[in-house]
């Protein structure tokens, strides 16, 4: 028993010293300031996996669910100009954290009549 402990301790210490082998690094939050993005229902328009209809934005070609404001705070999602029916433009600020957009501001821009 004592000999096996003497063997295991140096092996574990060696593994812990290998950079990137044991501990994964988390990505720092990506800051978004006053950027015009696409906004829509994540499930209906951006085909994200989820339950029900939830607000999402597409930033630089990638869609993220939104925290800090909800789909129902911006009108009827199922109206002709709603998030489930069309993709809208919004001016946003916030940060991307753990694959979600944390909105500090979200301004829905006027509907032009065309889906983006």
What residue ranges belong to the model's regions?
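Bacterial N-terminal signal peptides that target proteins for export
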Residues: 1-9
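OB-fold/S1-family single-stranded nucleic acid-binding modules
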Residues: 97-116
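Short nucleic-acid-contacting surface segments enriched for D/E, G, S/T with interspersed K/R
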Residues: 75-91
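Structural detector for short beta-strands of small beta-barrel domains
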Residues: 29-53, 58
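Short, isolated positions in well-ordered beta-strands
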Residues: 64-65
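Bacterial N-terminal signal peptides
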Residues: 8-19
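Boundary at the C-terminal end of the N-terminal hydrophobic targeting segment
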Residues: 22-26
């Amino acid at each position: 028993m004592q000999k096996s402990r003497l063997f295991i301790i140096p092996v574990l210490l060696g593994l812990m010293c290998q950079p990137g082998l044991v501990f994964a690094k988390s990505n720092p939050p990506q800051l978004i300031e006053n950027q015009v993005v696409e906004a829509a229902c994540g499930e209906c328009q951006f085909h994200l996996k989820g339950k029900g209809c939830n607000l999402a934005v597409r930033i630089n070609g990638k869609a993220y669910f939104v925290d800090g404001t909800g789909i129902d705070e911006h009108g009827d999602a199922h109206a002709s100009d709603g998030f489930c029916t069309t993709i809208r433009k919004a001016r946003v600020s916030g940060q991307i954290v753990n694959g979600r957009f944390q909105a500090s501001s979200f301004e829905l821009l006027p509907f032009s009549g065309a889906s983006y």
